[in-house]
Amino acid sequence: RNIENQLREAGVDTTHITWFSTDAKGPFSTDAKGTLMNGINVTYRGKGVIPSKTEYYRAHTAVRELGPGDVDLDKIFVSEGVRWAHTGGIFTLLSPKTAELAVEFMKKAGEQGTLRSFDLNYRSKVEPDKQKAHGINRKIVAETDFLVGNQGDFSDALGYETAAEKGVPFEEWLDAYADMLRVVAKDYQNLKLIGTQLRAPHSADRISWTAVLYDTQADQIHQATLRENIEITDRTGGGDSFASAVIAAIMEGKGYDEAVEWGAAHGILVQETPGDTTMVSKKMVLSEVARAKKGGGVSALR
């Protein structure tokens, strides 16, 4: 219940949480030995030349037991009219059942005209078999409107490669990345938007940062303002924060030029704070967008 309370403190609606019991009673029960737990990840943030490192404990977690039919999707998408559906590559690869649930979830959302996004977010420690990951992820991408993934994600999670090598000038890399996105968009004509954050690490605590969105229908790249050589506190959460801010901007009716700026701003702000759970306000995001566009410094708020 501690996790539920923390979610409530952050303003998250917890009414749809599925609770597993340990008394061997009901549809979501274990063997009465308490063998299910909530997932844990432990991250060393890194410092200087020492890279960050994350370890996961996902075995015996309740979420791995969720499968098709376990979530009342009619209630979510029909009765409640949820406007946006999102899932990611960590959840989808936790177990065969979560993969099936993710496909069911995205298909149901699509039937109701709900916008759907999928963050590839490949983690080899969750699913080391890339061929297996490709097969699962391709089913979900076929049910997606907004796809999120960096160069490594597209290679590891879907099997797409870019022509550019690591370390090439940014413009050369962006051209190669855009060419790859055009191939992805041709293969999955359901996709409306593809995006990613771009992090160039100079050390564990100093990066350059931007983001791009590719409008598949207009064949147009939208790039956020580049932030160069920025000191950060903790690199975790930058990708999730990029995606969530882009989604928020689109849901507010903003264009892609503005949406990508929101995504980049939110992403860098979360990397300036410990952990990967945002406590950043919309006001802070808009302020950072304005600051970056002006190329200005940081003034104290009094």
Report each predicted region and the residues it spans.
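Conserved N-terminal subdomain of the carbohydrate kinase-like
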Residues: 1-89, 286-302
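Hydrophobic beta-strand scaffold residues
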Residues: 14, 116-117, 148
